């Protein structure tokens, strides 16, 4: 295997060689086929695999998988990510187009989500697995027939599980590519934020609620329906973890807009290319193009301090980009933790605001009352039994449904003038 920059060799060679710092790739210089590091690596690879010795099919396959010369890097984790994500995508498209109605509640009430059943692109969704299945692993071979598997919502579980495996493998593939190119693994670390959010919503929450029927429908309107139902059940808007997630996402978007506008406003004009005298590792001097600044970091910081306040500055561009990456990643992590806690009905971290306050003996509703009324309304809409409507078109309600009956003795006591 080709020698890496960390002093390791692959299992194809069976031995290790010490790492030569002279072969390390300079990340600041463009990666071209004429670089000395690439030439050394190629020369070493030719020494390890002489042209006269034919390579076995397995060795050629391993070199093709781990080669960074491919147009798209495959990698060993890509061998797992590509088929799982492709399976999830194909089944999702087929289910959106032609999946039959699903017994989502396990009571015989069918819910349709496909386009052929009358839904449009907004209302179409992959309906979650039936509540009768619960958390059981429900592959195709566990059902008596394909029709039974479709009616019980088997495609939803297939899509979700393959998708989760695929995105985790994709994140590990990013780490693998960074390792091959001798880069730091922060790209893979940043991608853990959407992975954590997806796992929390699609896997952890159904597990905590006792069935995949509580999962998010895979569609546009299904996503918003899940959000409103989640708010009604757990009041996630009052969770500090969710609020930190909102701060991270919106704050990260604000910082990206500020950074992009400052950089665009301070871009330097392209100067004439100047040459600088540099000394190579062999001790000889050579002319090398001198790097020119892309934008003026000092002018951007001066503008920012003048516009906001004197302390609003960063010491270097590295600190700027670290904040741009760390703020949204930390926010999404905290929101995912909030969903995980809500999945197991652990709502003690949520803020409990008073339902009302009294000012001069006047009841003043708070925003908490508005949220509570919205939650109750969503609960009412989600009830399984629809209300009965009268001839006038208004729903009919019985007083006994909302007020407990009063006993005769209690009623006579309340109406007695001597009480």
From Swiss-Prot:
Its main location: membrane. It is found in: Cellular thylakoid membrane. The record marks 234 as: Stabilizes free radical intermediate. Homodimer. Synthesizes chlorophyll f or chlorophyllide f (Chl f, 2-formyl chlorophyll a), probably by oxidation of chlorophyll a or chlorophyllide a and reduction of plastoquinone. The reaction is probably light-dependent. Chl f absorbs far red light (FRL, 707 nm in 100% methanol), and is synthesized when cells are grown in FRL, where it provides the advantage of extending the spectral range of harvested light in terrestrial cyanobacteria. Chl f synthesis is probably light-dependent. Belongs to the reaction center PufL/M/PsbA/D family. This is Light-dependent chlorophyll f synthase. It comes from Synechococcus sp. (strain ATCC 29403 / PCC 7335). The gene is chlF.
């Amino acid at each position: 295997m080709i020698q890496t920059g960390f002093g390791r060799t692959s299992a194809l060679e069976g031995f290790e060689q010490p790492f030569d710092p002279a072969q390390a790739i300079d990340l600041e210089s463009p990666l071209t086929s004429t670089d000395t590091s690439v030439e050394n690596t190629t020369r070493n690879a030719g020494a390890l695999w002489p042209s006269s010795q034919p390579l076995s099919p397995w060795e050629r396959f391993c070199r093709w998988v781990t080669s960074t010369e491919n147009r798209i890097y495959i990698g060993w984790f890509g061998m797992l990510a590509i088929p799982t994500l492709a399976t999830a995508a194909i089944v999702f498209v087929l289910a959106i187009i032609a999946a039959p109605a699903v017994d989502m509640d396990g009571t015989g009430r069918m819910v349709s989500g496909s386009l052929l059943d009358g839904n449009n692109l907004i209302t179409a969704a992959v309906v979650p697995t039936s509540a009768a299945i619960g958390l059981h692993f429900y592959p195709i071979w566990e059902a008596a027939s394909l029709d039974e598997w479709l009616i019980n919502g088997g495609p939803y579980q297939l899509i979700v599980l393959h998708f989760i495996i695929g995105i985790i493998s994709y994140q590990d593939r990013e780490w693998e590519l960074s390792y091959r190119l001798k880069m730091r693994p922060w790209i893979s670390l940043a991608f853990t934020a959407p992975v954590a959010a997806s796992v929390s919503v699609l896997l952890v929450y159904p597990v905590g609620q006792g069935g995949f029927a509580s999962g998010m429908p895979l569609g546009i309107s299904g996503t918003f329906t899940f959000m409103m139902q989640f708010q009604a059940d757990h009041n996630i808007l009052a969770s500090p973890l969710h609020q930190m997630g909102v701060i991270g996402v919106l704050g990260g978007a604000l910082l990206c807009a500020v950074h992009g506008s400052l950089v665009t406003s301070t871009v330097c004009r392209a100067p004439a290319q100047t040459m600088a005298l540099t000394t190579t590792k062999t001790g000889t001097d050579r002319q090398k193009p001198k790097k020119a600044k892309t934008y003026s970091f000092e002018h951007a910081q001066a503008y920012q301090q003048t516009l906001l306040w004197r302390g609003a500055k960063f010491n270097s561009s590295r600190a700027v980009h670290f904040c741009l990456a760390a703020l949204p990643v930390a926010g999404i992590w905290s929101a995912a933790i909030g969903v995980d806690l809500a999945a197991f009905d652990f709502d003690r971290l949520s803020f409990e605001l008073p339902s009302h306050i009294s000012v001069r003996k006047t009841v003043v509703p708070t925003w908490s009352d508005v949220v509570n009324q919205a939650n109750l309304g969503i609960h009412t809409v989600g009830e399984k039994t629809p209300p009965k409507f009268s001839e006038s078109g208004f729903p009919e309600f019985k007083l006994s449904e909302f007020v407990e009956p009063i006993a005769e003795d209690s009623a006579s006591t309340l109406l007695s003038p001597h009480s």
